[in-house]
Curated annotation (Swiss-Prot):
Main location: cytoplasm
Record-given protein name: Translation initiation factor IF-1
Subcellular location: Cytoplasm
GO cellular component: cytosol
Lineage: Bacteria, Pseudomonadati, Pseudomonadota, Alphaproteobacteria, Sphingomonadales
């Protein structure tokens, strides 16, 4: 079984939400709901409002994503 193709996009965190969720505004001005990836949680990488992040999206649901990297 092949792994699905993920879309990677850059965005900016607009709002912090409960349960480690974030509202992220993508480069193309769409807003999505994102959560931090497991490695970011494990290493306790903090994501704050205004941070530039890399988000993985599945082609099936383009309204939710996983934050995989925080740019410095």
């Amino acid at each position: 079984m092949a792994k699905e193709e993920l879309l990677e996009m850059r965005g900016q965190v607009v709002e912090l939400l409960p349960n480690a969720m974030f509202r992220v505004k993508l480069e193309n001005d769409h807003e999505i709901l994102g959560h931090t990836a497991g490695k970011m949680r494990k290493n306790r990488i903090r994501v704050l409002v205004g941070d530039e992040v890399l988000v993985e999206l599945t082609p099936y649901d383009l309204t939710k994503g996983r934050i995989t990297y925080r740019f410095k």
